[in-house]
């Protein structure tokens, strides 16, 4: 049995990653998932979080992935998300400003914008955390 499987991370703008990996950790609304080669076929929603994977050469990699859908079929996994970026592509200053804007919107108490502000806050915090890890 092969110990790797194909991972594709796709956003509306571009393909972020396409290669073989040994394992991946990602989050859905229930918790943290670990996916290994030959995993059962499945589809799950994902939440904005830091995704960690080990590539075929054994290198550990991390990136921010916003909410989306993960599909596993015939030893191939595709993550479709609104946005995804490795630490090198994250502008820390921009992420911190986004966090401040989201916090301000939450304090204003506009019910319509509350969920959007909470999601924006989560995305900015995860981006900041990833950037500070590296």
Curated annotation (Swiss-Prot):
Primary role: Produces ATP from ADP in the presence of a proton gradient across the membrane.
Name the record gives this protein: ATP synthase epsilon chain
Subunit field text: F-type ATPases have 2 components, CF(1) - the catalytic core - and CF(0) - the membrane proton channel. CF(1) has five subunits: alpha(3), beta(3), gamma(1), delta(1), epsilon(1). CF(0) has three main subunits: a, b and c.
Cellular localization per UniProt: Cell membrane
Keyword Membrane: yes
Predominant place of localization: membrane
Molecular function as annotated in GO: ATP binding; proton-transporting ATP synthase activity, rotational mechanism
GO terms under cellular component: plasma membrane; proton-transporting ATP synthase complex
